[in-house]
């Protein structure tokens, strides 16, 4: 699907989640795969929970179907020998096809409820992407990016303004590290202001820094833009 969610298509988001763990290929390249290769297939018109993408890539012989009837297949991880059949099944061209030795699961039957990095429990999701529903999907992904355990200001005061600033950052192609750098500058300004006795200005700079600390994390999660240096920079 060409529809973007927070500036990323479904394919771009999946590729960022998996990184170097997989080698992207098209349907035309399936015939070139080695016999011992495995293939991970995703429909490009769905938004996938990050945990499902990672789990599917790490679990061979698995077909992911939606929970709602008629339980269409939306993703699969199969041996190369079954790639063509799995592709037809996920594409909807062969709804009744069977894949020998492949387990069928749905988001609700896969136990991935605990998201360690975000310190919260939430069922994994697979949602259809449409142009009309893109704003709702962006809100869903933004809400999902919040930690279950956080401070009261971050939980209740920052979400609405943070979402607007994240949207501006995506539009202006700002990176999370650039937002973090702006927060670091504000820390220095706050320290200088407190040293000079300008407590009001220093306090304002400090609060703005805490706001940007929320923004950079949300921007990183909704756009899947992160790096190890950036992780340490943020902390």
Predicted regions and their residues:
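N-terminal glycine-rich phosphate-binding loop and ensuing alpha1 helix
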Residues: 1-30
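Transmembrane helix-loop junction
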Residues: 25-26, 171, 221-222
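Active-site nucleotide-sugar/metal-binding loop of Leloir-type enzymes
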Residues: 29-38
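Short aromatic/hydrophobic "clamp" motif used to bind/position activated sugar donors
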Residues: 39, 45
């Amino acid at each position: 699907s060409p529809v973007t969610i927070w500036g990323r298509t479904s394919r771009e988001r999946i590729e960022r989640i998996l990184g170097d763990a997989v080698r992207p290929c098209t349907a035309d390249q399936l015939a070139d795969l080695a016999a011992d290769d495995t293939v991970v297939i995703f429909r490009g018109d769905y938004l996938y929970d990050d945990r499902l993408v990672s789990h599917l890539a790490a679990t061979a012989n698995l077909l992911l179907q939606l929970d709602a009837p008629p339980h269409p297949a939306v993703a699969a991880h199969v041996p190369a020998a079954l790639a063509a059949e799995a592709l037809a099944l996920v594409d909807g061209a062969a709804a009744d096809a069977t894949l020998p030795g492949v387990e069928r699961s749905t988001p609700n039957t896969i136990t991935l409820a605990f998201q360690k990095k975000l310190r919260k429990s939430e069922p994994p999701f697979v949602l259809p992407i449409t142009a009309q529903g893109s704003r709702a999907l962006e809100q869903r992904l933004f809400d999902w990016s919040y930690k279950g355990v956080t401070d009261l200001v971050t939980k209740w005061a920052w979400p609405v303004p943070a979402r607007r600033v994240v949207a501006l950052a995506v539009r202006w192609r700002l990176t999370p590290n650039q937002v973090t750098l702006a927060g670091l500058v504000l820390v220095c300004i706050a320290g200088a202001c407190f040293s000079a006795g300008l407590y009001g200005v220093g306090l304002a700079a400090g609060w703005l820094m805490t706001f940007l600390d929320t923004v950079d994390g949300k921007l990183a999660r909704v756009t899947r833009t992160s790096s190890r240096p950036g992780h340490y920079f943020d902390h």
